[in-house]
């Protein structure tokens, strides 16, 4: 009777997992407001799109501000609405209170603001993503950006060397080859929660932070603060 070492079997399995490669048109990293709109826009143009989130429970989550519209970002919501975006439609179905700000002043500064049912807003947006053709949701942490060093003349017409993105790699080693990568990481990159002198390394609302992608961005030459 011959016994096969478990360690060797596990290593072979891990090696096979690391070799898994999928090809898509666009990778969107992050599933907040920006990520959802970017992924939907790409998918609706017929591009095979995958959107990554550290947790499907955090899709369109609003841990800091449950309002849509208002003086600061109301114009962005209206622009998205004009371009076929989903944020304005979703808040119409999930708001619990709305108010016209600056109503006592001139119409130039009137600004509609709606307060969302956070749980319902997130649930409905997730449903929209799941039902969208050409769009797949992946619960995974993207750790590395993959790129090639190419001659800038071939990309922008300028002389010198530059980098051309070719995909991403997740924490489990799966590679997604893509023609474009859209970063919508929000406040998750090496996130910290400060409470007085106490520092907790965590993402918003106690969710997992993205602790590896920052290093990949730095390696690519992107300045990080």
Question: Residue spans of the language-model regions?
Answer:
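A short, basic/flexible loop-to-alpha-helix module at the beginning of a structural domain
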Residues: 4-6, 12, 16-23
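Conserved N-terminal/central alpha/beta ligand/cofactor-binding core
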Residues: 40-147, 172, 184-201, 208-213, ...
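Beta-sheet entry/capping signal
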Residues: 26, 48-50, 179-181
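Beta1/beta-strand and adjacent pyrophosphate-binding region of the FAD-binding site
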Residues: 20-34
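Conserved beta-strand-loop-beta-strand element in the redox core of flavoprotein oxidoreductases
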Residues: 146-174
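Core beta-strand elements of the Rossmann-like FAD/NAD(P) dinucleotide-binding domain
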Residues: 22-24, 169-180
């Amino acid at each position: 009777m011959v016994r096969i070492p478990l360690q060797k079997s596990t290593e072979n399995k891990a090696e096979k997992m690391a070799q898994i490669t999928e090809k898509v048109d666009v990778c969107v990293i992050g599933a907040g407001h920006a990520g959802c709109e970017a992924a939907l826009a790409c998918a609706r143009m017929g591009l095979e799109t995958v959107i990554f989130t550290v947790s499907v429970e955090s899709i369109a989550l609003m841990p800091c501000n449950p309002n849509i519209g208002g003086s600061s970002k109301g114009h962005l919501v209206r622009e998205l609405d004009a371009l076929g975006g989903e944020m304005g439609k979703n808040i119409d179905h999930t708001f619990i209170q709305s108010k016209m700000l600056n109503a006592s002043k001139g119409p130039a500064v009137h600004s509609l603001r709606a307060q969302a049912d956070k749980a319902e807003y997130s649930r409905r947006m997730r449903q929209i993503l799941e039902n969208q053709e050409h769009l797949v949701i992946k619960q995974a942490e993207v750790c590395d950006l993959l790129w090639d060093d190419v001659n800038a003349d071939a990309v922008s017409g300028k002389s010198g060397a530059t980098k051309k993105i070719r995909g991403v790699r997740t924490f489990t080693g799966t590679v997604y080859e893509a023609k474009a990568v859209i970063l919508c990481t929000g406040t998750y990159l090496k996130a910290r929660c400060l409470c007085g002198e106490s520092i907790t390394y965590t993402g918003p609302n106690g969710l997992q932070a993205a602790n590896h992608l920052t290093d990949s961005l730095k390696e690519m030459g992107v300045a990080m603060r």
